[in-house]
């Protein structure tokens, strides 16, 4: 049994293929998937998937590199986060790389709106005690700092969350673990150039790991460059299994157990 802890099944590349994807998931023993919300406008579609299929769940949140869209208030996030089948807040966080690239080298000082948005997501998560799905790219220092400033190590620590599609150093991983977070590995782990990330994964405690596809992006080897989907998450488990001296099936069961522990609202949804 495998669980894809992060996918975007509402995106156009995947939603039209959903019946085929579900068949492929079944054949690959991928029994569950968490469908990630990236804008408030997208939420209804993501939530519809979770309400329609009993092995899908949803989040609510706004991705940090979506600038010119409706900005949710804490109350917006709280109201949607309390709906059935919504088990996390996110994805949220900071992405200085994407915004700098798109905006012609904009400085970090120009991205205060990202930090304000992140704080609102943290406050919503704290209010309703939902875990968060964290996106951080070229911004780990600020991500960790804001989590600490917002009391993540205190009253939100019990809810925690996950640093998804992890690509950072072991030091960042340890800091995230110390705050009560889990770490999720994607198809990047299979890339030839990702030896440093595999070293982090080899070090990672077994009880704090998740696996994901981040589909339709980041298809693992041997499908790199193609459209990703949740049925490919066992390829991530295979690499983790090699690093840990386990079988892929054991990694699948272990990470599914971790998923259940991190997202307790699963049991009530």
Describe the residue ranges of each PLM region.
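Mid-domain alpha/beta scaffold segments of enzyme catalytic cores
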Residues: 1-269
